[in-house]
């Protein structure tokens, strides 16, 4: 890979967004461009994530101020990204969803666990972003332009069986 890719995280003040930010700050091919939070807009990242003090000078911006990037990570509550898909998908060619919005392909199964899906027409677009190899006890991220990241329950059991 040549050059760094710019990355922005929507919902970076939460646990999943904060952990993704922590990892991205150390990645040799990523440059974190923006992080959003409505509640903490204008505050430095370390105000919410003290473990990142001295690692970045980024400040939270409101989602409305989000600029285009190469990669957009969405760490929003379940259902929010799906409802605002058109807005966010226009900002980056690569989307990584940390919520449950696009983990399941079957709208009936989604309804069973999360309620009615706001955009069932998009369920087939996202790739489940982790492949687990139970024989080797490992996993790998698969490349795609729209990734649905599994929760811990989806990855951990095969690794420890």
Language-model-detected regions and their locations in the chain:
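N-terminal Rossmann-like NAD(P) cofactor-binding subdomain of oxidoreductases
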Residues: 1-161
């Amino acid at each position: 890979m040549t050059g760094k890719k710019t990355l922005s995280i929507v919902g970076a003040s939460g646990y999943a967004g904060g952990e993704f930010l922590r990892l991205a700050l150390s990645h040799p091919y990523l440059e974190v461009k923006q992080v959003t939070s409505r509640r903490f807009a204008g505050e430095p990242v370390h105000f919410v994530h003290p473990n990142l003090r001295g690692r970045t000078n980024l400040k939270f911006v409101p989602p409305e101020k989000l600029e285009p990037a190469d990669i957009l990570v969405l760490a929003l509550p379940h259902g929010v990204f799906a409802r605002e898909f058109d807005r966010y998908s226009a900002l980056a060619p690569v989307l990584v969803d940390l919520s449950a919005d696009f983990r399941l392909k079957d709208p009936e199964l989604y309804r069973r666990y999360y309620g009615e899906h706001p955009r069932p027409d998009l369920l087939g677009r996202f790739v489940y972003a982790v492949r687990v190899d139970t024989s080797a006890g490992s996993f790998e991220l698969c490349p795609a332009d729209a990734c649905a990241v599994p929760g811990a329950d989806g990855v951990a059991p095969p690794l420890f069986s």
